[in-house]
């Protein structure tokens, strides 16, 4: 998907499960505007492997695509062929959304710093202490009051960044993707201690690896590295965050 400066959304590629938002499962080989969002000014978008999401300038969240595991947040498992508003968040102003990579979870961040999660709950990636999934947005209470400013979803894990520069991760732990120095699963948001004090200002998440940049421009990487995706000239998996320049 692509978002223009005037708030229009275009999508293209494989159309299975209606994830392109064009009211069909047909694929598209060039960018096409999503007609259902033309009357809205969109400010943020996110793509999962089988579902998509968009946030309007007024804080409304829309999702569409595969509905399995409740990943769309509409209270059911129904696939949506066009964008549909997530009514369970209509009392909140949503400012960011993240869709799971190769996965079925979704995260949303509101303007008052609250994080909501829903969809498949395997390995605790929804951040509420268990592995149960849910089909409507539920608050990740562990992150209340810590000033979250960015959220991301990888494959079977989730990440959040606070305004104070702390990185929190949770979910599946193999490939050391969580950055805690262990391959154990973590079912509630937990601070990545090795980055404490480094003032992280932005994070990026792949399917199985993560990057974080500090206010001084240093970049740290951790997780899977089988294709050299950490940029450290090796294919060795990092158990903990490793700085590279």
Each model region followed by its residue ranges:
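Conserved core positions of repeat-based scaffolds
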Residues: 1-2, 11, 51-54, 63, ...
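Conserved beta-strand position repeated across blades of beta-propeller domains
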Residues: 2, 32-35, 46, 54, ...
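Structural signature of WD-repeat beta-propellers
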Residues: 4, 15, 48-49, 56, ...
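Plant-skewed but cross-kingdom recognition/interaction modules and surfaces
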Residues: 8, 56, 60, 100, ...
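Short glycine/serine- and acidic-residue-enriched loop/turn motifs that recur at repeat junctions
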Residues: 10-28, 66-80, 116, 120-134, ...
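Conserved loop/turn at the beginning of each blade in beta-propeller domains
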Residues: 24, 38, 46, 76-79, ...
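Flexible inter-domain hinge/linker segments at boundaries of tandem extracellular adhesion modules
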Residues: 29, 34-40, 86-92, 138-146, ...
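WD40/WD-repeat beta-propeller blade-loop signature
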Residues: 30, 41, 48-51, 82, ...
């Amino acid at each position: 998907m692509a978002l223009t400066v005037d708030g229009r959304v275009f999508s293209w590629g494989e159309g299975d499960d209606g994830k392109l938002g064009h009211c069909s499962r047909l694929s598209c080989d060039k960018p096409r505007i999503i007609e259902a969002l033309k009357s809205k000014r969109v400010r943020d978008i996110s793509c999962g492997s089988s579902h998509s999401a968009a946030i309007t300038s007024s804080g409304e969240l829309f999702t569409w695509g595969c509905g399995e595991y409740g990943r769309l947040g509409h209270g059911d498992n129904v696939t949506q062929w066009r964008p549909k508003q997530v009514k369970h968040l209509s009392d909140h102003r949503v400012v960011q959304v993240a869709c799971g990579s190769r996965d079925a979870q979704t995260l949303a961040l509101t303007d008052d710093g609250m994080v909501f999660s829903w969809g498949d709950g395997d390995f605790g990636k929804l951040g509420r202490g268990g592995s149960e999934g849910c089909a409507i947005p539920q608050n990740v209470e562990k992150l209340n009051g810590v000033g979250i400013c960015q959220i991301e979803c990888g494959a079977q894990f989730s990440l959040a960044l606070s305004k104070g520069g702390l990185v929190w991760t949770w979910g599946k732990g193999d490939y050391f993707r969580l950055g805690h120095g262990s391959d154990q699963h973590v079912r509630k948001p937990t601070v990545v201690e090795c980055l404490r004090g480094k003032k992280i200002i932005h994070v990026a998440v792949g399917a199985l690896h993560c990057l974080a940049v500090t206010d001084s421009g240093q970049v740290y990487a951790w997780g899977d590295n089988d294709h050299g995706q950490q940029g450290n000239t090796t294919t060795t998996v990092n158990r903990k965050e490793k700085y590279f320049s």
